[in-house]
């Protein structure tokens, strides 16, 4: 059985969030929390919140053992881009793309043996 949590339209660039997601993919939940707490990236607290939600979903919805959970899937997709303009010299303007992410974490119980 799998439990899933998704954070949609999070205001962090997918490229930056993927750096942190790659650190925890395939790890046990306790180990993943430790990694996230000691990773000095802006995406760490956001991903920790999504992981906490996935663990809570596993415990509440599927009666899984929290101490026996492993992250089976973790990925970041691109969300909608907010387009802004920055005024430049001589009346020009340049585009600023504020990128957003959809962060998905799937946890399941560890296989016995």
Curated annotation (Swiss-Prot):
Keywords: Ribonucleoprotein, Ribosomal protein, RNA-binding, rRNA-binding
Molecular function terms from GO: rRNA binding; structural constituent of ribosome
CDD domains, per the entry: Ribosomal_L22
Any one biological process term the GO annotation gives: translation
Taxonomy, superkingdom: Bacteria
UniProt-listed Pfam families: Ribosomal_L22
Keyword Mitochondrion: no
InterPro entries for the chain: Ribosomal_uL22 (IPR001063), Ribosomal_uL22_bac/chlpt-type (IPR005727), Ribosomal_uL22_bac/org-type (IPR047867), Ribosomal_uL22_CS (IPR018260), Ribosomal_uL22_sf (IPR036394)
One annotated Gene Ontology cellular component of this protein: cytosolic large ribosomal subunit
Role this protein plays: This protein binds specifically to 23S rRNA; its binding is stimulated by other ribosomal proteins, e.g. L4, L17, and L20. It is important during the early stages of 50S assembly. It makes multiple contacts with different domains of the 23S rRNA in the assembled 50S subunit and ribosome. The globular domain of the protein is located near the polypeptide exit tunnel on the outside of the subunit, while an extended beta-hairpin is found that lines the wall of the exit tunnel in the center of the 70S ribosome.
Family membership: Belongs to the universal ribosomal protein uL22 family.
Subunit note: Part of the 50S ribosomal subunit.
HAMAP family attached to this UniProt entry: Ribosomal_uL22_B
PANTHER family with a match to the protein in the record: CHLOROPLAST 50S RIBOSOMAL PROTEIN L22-RELATED (PTHR13501), LARGE RIBOSOMAL SUBUNIT PROTEIN UL22M (PTHR13501:SF8)
Full protein name: Large ribosomal subunit protein uL22
Provenance organism: Geobacillus kaustophilus (strain HTA426)
């Amino acid at each position: 059985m799998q439990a899933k949590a998704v954070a949609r339209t999070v205001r962090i660039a997918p490229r930056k969030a993927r750096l942190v997601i790659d650190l925890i993919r395939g790890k046990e939940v306790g180990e993943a929390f430790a990694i996230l707490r000691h990773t000095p990236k802006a995406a760490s607290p956001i991903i920790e919140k999504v992981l906490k939600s996935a663990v809570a979903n596993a415990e509440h919805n599927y009666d899984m053992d929290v101490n026996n959970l492993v992250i089976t899937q973790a990925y970041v997709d691109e969300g909608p881009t907010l387009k802004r303009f920055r005024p430049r010299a001589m009346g020009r303007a340049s585009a600023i793309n504020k990128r957003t992410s959809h962060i998905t974490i799937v946890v399941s119980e560890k296989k016995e043996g």
